[in-house]
């Protein structure tokens, strides 16, 4: 769902929507978490943030992707939502959800990318979301960590105007590689 609110300012109303997080997976079945909603747009204020991805079920399943941040014409783009975590236990792979991308802005700052979700015991961490483009770019989100066996998620790229890229997530303790650092 999406949460709406309206702020009255002297020159008119500023309408903003904020993404709401995805539903969690079932606690007993192999269900994956739902994706987070995208943030709404804004003319001059900070746009709505993307909702966080839902966590996976207890045994199997992957985390949901974070929602993308909203676009802002003259303000700051919304931040991307965090990816949901993979399942806690079980013998099958549970991947972390990808982080949402930061929202763009024409004249303001881009939003920051969301962090990738942490993997379950087995599986890969989610990739971080890209930073939003703007006069100053948003930061890329960090990649999610793997736990026992699996690769860390890759860090998100910075926006086009430069900025800080996200760090890669750590690989699994037993087997797996670290995620790659995002590009600037």
Locate predicted features.
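Long, distal/terminal scaffolding or interaction modules
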Residues: 13-184
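Single conserved hydrophobic/aromatic residue that forms the stacking wall/gate
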Residues: 1-15
């Amino acid at each position: 769902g999406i949460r709406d609110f309206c702020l009255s300012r002297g020159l008119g109303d500023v309408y903003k929507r904020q993404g709401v997080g995805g539903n969690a997976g079932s606690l007993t079945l192999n269900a994956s978490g739902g994706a987070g909603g995208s943030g709404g747009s804004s003319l001059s204020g900070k746009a709505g943030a993307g909702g966080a991805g839902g966590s996976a079920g207890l045994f199997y399943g992957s985390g949901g992707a974070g929602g993308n941040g909203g676009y802002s014409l003259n303000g700051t783009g919304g931040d991307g939502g965090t990816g949901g975590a993979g399942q806690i236990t079980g013998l099958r792979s549970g991947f972390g959800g990808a982080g949402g991308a930061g929202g763009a802005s024409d004249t303001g700052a881009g939003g920051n990318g969301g962090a990738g979700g942490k993997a379950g015991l087995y599986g890969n961490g989610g990739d971080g979301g890209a930073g939003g483009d703007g006069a100053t770019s948003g930061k890329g989100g960090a990649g999610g960590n793997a736990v026992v066996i699996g690769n860390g998620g890759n860090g998100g790229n910075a926006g086009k105007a430069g900025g800080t890229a996200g760090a890669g997530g750590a690989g699994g303790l037993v087997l797996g590689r670290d995620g790659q650092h995002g590009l600037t």
